[in-house]
Amino acid sequence: MSSECIKNVKAFAILLCGIGHPQNIGAILRSSYYLGVDRVYTTNCKFIDSNGNSILKSSAPLTPSVSKASSGVLEIFQPTHLNDPEKFVDFVKSRGWFVIGSGIQKQGAILKSNISTQSEDSVNTNKAGCHQNPQLLVIGNEGFGIPQKIGDMCDRWINIEPGRTIDPDVDSLNVSVACALLINSLMPQSKIKR
């Protein structure tokens, strides 16, 4: 992350943890660019399955399929790939960034907050409940979510509540759709042109 971005108190970045489908990466890049995200980071992530086995989920490579799914945005708004996501999250936190984890579960517990709920830590939030420090939104892998080590570093967890009682087989949105909704809800108001 550039020092200019670190100093920008209204900065908003996204960390994609092992998003494996090129169409999802492309759609996230397009939405991120359109909605004013400053930077997107991709990374490979290690997960532990129910048997204690380590599983590596790789981020989709930046191929023509990603470019097509982004409708060409990849050519003007390229993500930065990180080799050590835990070190990166620790670095931005040490610089005053507010790290937000997204998902429906954290360590097996259903999350109770949603995107319309104010942060329990209301220090440094504006009247709309948006954090005024620079923000890093962490988006997890399509099947495994956010790795526990990164999840434990998050300052706040959010999710999108369904608008109805849903079938158990439809437990979430597509990651690119969820990401766009979260960006729109969390983006600092000063970045949104009226």
Segments and roles (model prediction):
Residues M1-E120:
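RNA substrate-binding interface of SAM-dependent RNA methyltransferases
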Residues I100-V175:
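Active-site/ligand-binding-proximal alpha/beta "capping" segment
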Residues I19-G20, N141-G145, L181-I183:
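A short, hydrophobic secondary-structure junction motif
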Residues I76, V89, Q132-L136, D155, ...:
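A generic structural signal for ordered secondary structure
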Residues Y33-Y34, L62-V73, Q148-R194:
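Structured adenosyl-cofactor binding patch, chiefly the S-adenosyl-L-methionine
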Residues N51, K57, E86-K87, S94-G96, ...:
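N-terminal regions of ATP-driven nucleic-acid and macromolecular assemblies
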